Amino acid sequence: MEDLNQLKLVLVKNKKTNKWLAEKLGVNQTTVSKWCTNTTQPDLMTLKKISKLLNVSVSEIINFD
């Protein structure tokens, strides 16, 4: 299965951690970890919040290929 999101890569590029993102979104760090490993996916509203927090477009987080 191909990775749907590139969240882990985007976090690294922005020098941010799973813990930082979890705190900003008010979610459990385990949830962010699951997003980063593509075990589960964030919903569209959460993707929009993540893109604003990291100052990137949603298309930079999602792998459309």
Name each model feature, range by range.
Residues 1-17:
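A short, Lys/Arg-rich alpha-helix, primarily the initiator
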Residues 11, 22, 51:
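The alpha-helix within a helix-turn-helix
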Residues 7, 21-22, 32-35, 61:
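Conserved hydrophobic/aromatic packing and binding residues within compact polymer-binding modules
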Residues 45-60:
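DNA major-groove recognition helix of helix-turn-helix/homeodomain DNA-binding modules
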